[in-house]
């Protein structure tokens, strides 16, 4: 059998299997949306105004323990980054910055988990649907060649059924794109607040060093 004949026999399967594939992908898409929605909601919201003021006040007074308590009472990725930075107070700004950057990288991975699935479905589901439509049209003309008495009605019926695949592909893609953009916006805003907290801690802890017992104290004036 020639390669063309093999391909033709495959295309004559029609578009129904493509529809089932799109339905399966839509289930995956909805599952990702629900999982990401619950994850981002459960991560909590960091009260930047209130907790930020407490952090600045404690750190300017050299009270790192108080700053840690303020952060421990909060939720969200911002508090995780702040806690990582406060654990390194007294070891220099480089150690503080590296600890917060490492924590931010881990948080980014958690926030963006599975979002690539939504992006991929949003970009490719219409093409999968279009592929199903092409297969359906090929089958419609093949049916016409075997049933010439049916005329245009046979072709139109097959084409209309084939176009369903394109419609289903769009139905899968549009919600996926909307959800992807929504979650990406949430991630960007969260990471922006994380950066704001990190910069605040770096600036507030620049003059803090450790005493012999490991407690953090403000650096004395005059460099003594």
Where do the PLM segments sit?
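Short, conserved clusters of charged catalytic residues that mark active-site
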Residues: 3, 16, 50, 113-116, ...
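Predominantly long cytosolic amphipathic alpha-helical stalk/bundle segments
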Residues: 38, 43-151, 178-224
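Internal alpha-helical transmembrane segments of multi-pass membrane proteins, especially GPCRs
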Residues: 13, 23, 113-116, 120-123, ...
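Hydrophobic membrane-targeting segments
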Residues: 1-51
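Membrane-interfacial hairpin junctions
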Residues: 8-13, 144-156
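Hydrophobic alpha-helical transmembrane segments of polytopic membrane proteins
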Residues: 161-178
